[in-house]
């Protein structure tokens, strides 16, 4: 798969529109997320490992906010022969179209239902694994608990939710430190100060990170009895919750 370089914010613009997962972003998303999210490849690979451990035969897997299908592909590689179905959902037509191309490039006996729609409208049932990989942060904060409740209800006992998010910190010095470390990560991956600044402006109104404790409290309040942070690099984290 050819990966185009992300130069979306390389030219100065007087008006920065809110970030959207449109055709421009879909075309460079693989490069964008690799250069922007520390540990992304490890997260994707480990989601596959979790699938191998937790996915039961004849159950369903949900990848909510599937983007180009990286998590779905990682899962599918690990669950051959289990007669499972993956439901991969994204609300961006451009992302879904490119995701379908990526899925078509690999042969598998695991069916994938690729849905262009709102993850809040998806019926979740008979699930052994649900993935929210850098998705919840883009939902309105008031809708997040309702979605987590729906996921919990749709998971079978022993099923898991993998939740990856950018997080924020109540401790101001820690927030500043880890935010600066993340900016250094982006600089080291070739993003200019202009690109970093304009991307930040684009995301300001559409991505609202929670604290780690907010995530944990939300999950436990909806019934998850087992929770752990399993990955963190700077202000990016991935959590696992078991029903």
Curated annotation (Swiss-Prot):
Provide the alphabetized UniProt keywords: S-adenosyl-L-methionine, Transferase
Please tell me which top-level EC class this enzyme sits in: transferase
| An MF annotation (GO) of this entry | carboxyl- or carbamoyltransferase activity
| Record GO biological process | tRNA wobble uridine modification
| Keyword set includes S-adenosyl-L-methionine | yes
What the entry lists under Pfam families is as follows:
Methyltransf_25
Record's function text: Catalyzes the conversion of S-adenosyl-L-methionine (SAM) to carboxy-S-adenosyl-L-methionine (Cx-SAM).
Assembly with partners or alone: Homodimer.
Q: What is this protein called?
A: Carboxy-S-adenosyl-L-methionine synthase
User: What lineage is on file?
Assistant: Bacteria, Pseudomonadati, Pseudomonadota, Gammaproteobacteria, Alteromonadales
